[in-house]
């Protein structure tokens, strides 16, 4: 028979295996973290060498370190804002500028007067008409006339306002004025006065083509027909009168005479 195996070494073996697995897990985790850190540092190292040459390029840098320091030491007056490096002063020394300024001050002002740019004349107001030689149709007195009043009474504006503007303007602006003769103005005024004096009933009679007949004495009503003269007399009403009109001339006696009756209404009777 075999001797019994103690249980203590079996428990130690299980505990040793568990600790070994735990140590392996910690080791793998540490390696993974370290690898991730190395990758990040590698990316940073690869980006820095790319950015540094870009920053060191001369066309991207306005001032180098030496120029910036010299510019701070030899800074000009505070009014000058131009960020010019101090090394450029070697090309344009200050003593040369000072000598030029002194020579310019010594030159007499009468020999070389300062040049001035031509200035435009002040703009005239829109309401005032222009009387200069360069006056055009757009700025000669016509803009002051309102359109509504011109449409309401064109004769009055043409006779008064435009003639006044022509009188104010000089002889050089006659081409932009409207001149009216006195005869036409008088004729228009007479027509307006007559139109005001004549009543409406007389105006209707004036413009009608049928002349108003004279009032005749009442005659007896007859129904006789006179064939020799070629005229007929019919009974007359109170408001309507029939009158025979001979269309043919008196010297023409050929053929029967035609009688045409025209009704004429008396107005105002």
Curated annotation (Swiss-Prot):
GO terms for cellular component: B cell receptor complex. InterPro entries: Lime1. Pfam families: LIME1. Expressed in spleen and lung. Present in primary B-cells and peripheral T-cells (at protein level). The modification Phosphotyrosine is found at residues 137, 175, 207, 242, 261. Residues 261-264 are annotated as: Interaction with LCK, PLCG2 and PIK3R1. Residues 102-133 are annotated as: Disordered. Signal peptide: none annotated. The modification Phosphoserine is found at residue 263. Residues 175-178, 207-210 are annotated as: Interaction with CSK. Keywords: Adaptive immunity, Cell membrane, Immunity, Lipoprotein, Membrane, Palmitate, Phosphoprotein, Signal-anchor, Transmembrane, Transmembrane helix. Induction: Up-regulated in T-cells following TCR engagement. Involved in BCR (B-cell antigen receptor)-mediated signaling in B-cells and TCR (T-cell antigen receptor)-mediated T-cell signaling in T-cells. In absence of TCR signaling, may be involved in CD4-mediated inhibition of T-cell activation. Couples activation of these receptors and their associated kinases with distal intracellular events such as calcium mobilization or MAPK activation through the recruitment of PLCG2, GRB2, GRAP2, and other signaling molecules. This is Lck-interacting transmembrane adapter 1. It comes from Mus musculus. The gene is Lime1.
């Amino acid at each position: 028979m075999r001797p019994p195996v103690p249980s203590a070494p079996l428990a130690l073996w299980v505990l040793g295996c568990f600790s070994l697995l735990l140590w392996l897990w910690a080791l793998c985790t540490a390696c993974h973290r370290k690898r991730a850190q190395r990758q990040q540092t590698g990316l940073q190292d690869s980006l820095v060498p790319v950015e540094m040459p870009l920053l060191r390029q001369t066309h991207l840098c306005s001032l180098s370190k030496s120029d910036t320091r010299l510019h701070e030491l030899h800074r000009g007056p505070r009014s000058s804002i131009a960020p010019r490096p101090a090394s450029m002063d070697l090309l344009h020394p200050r003593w040369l500028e000072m000598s030029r300024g002194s020579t310019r001050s010594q030159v007499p002002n009468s020999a070389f007067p300062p040049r001035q740019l031509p200035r435009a004349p002040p703009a005239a107001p829109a309401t005032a008409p222009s009387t200069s030689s360069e006056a055009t149709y757009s700025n000669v007195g016509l803009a002051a006339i309102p359109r509504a009043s011109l449409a309401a009474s064109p004769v009055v504006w043409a006779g008064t306002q435009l003639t006044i503007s022509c009188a104010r303007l000089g002889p050089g602006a006659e081409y932009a004025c409207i001149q009216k003769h006195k005869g036409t103005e008088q004729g228009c005024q007479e027509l307006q006065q007559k139109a005001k004096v004549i009543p409406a009933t007389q105006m209707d009679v004036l413009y009608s083509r049928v002349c108003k007949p004279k009032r005749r004495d009442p005659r007896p009503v007859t129904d006789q027909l006179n064939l020799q003269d070629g005229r007929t007399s019919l009974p007359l009403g109170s408001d309507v009168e029939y009158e025979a009109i001979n269309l043919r001339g008196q010297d023409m006696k050929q053929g029967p005479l035609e009688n045409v009756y025209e009704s004429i209404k008396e107005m105002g009777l």
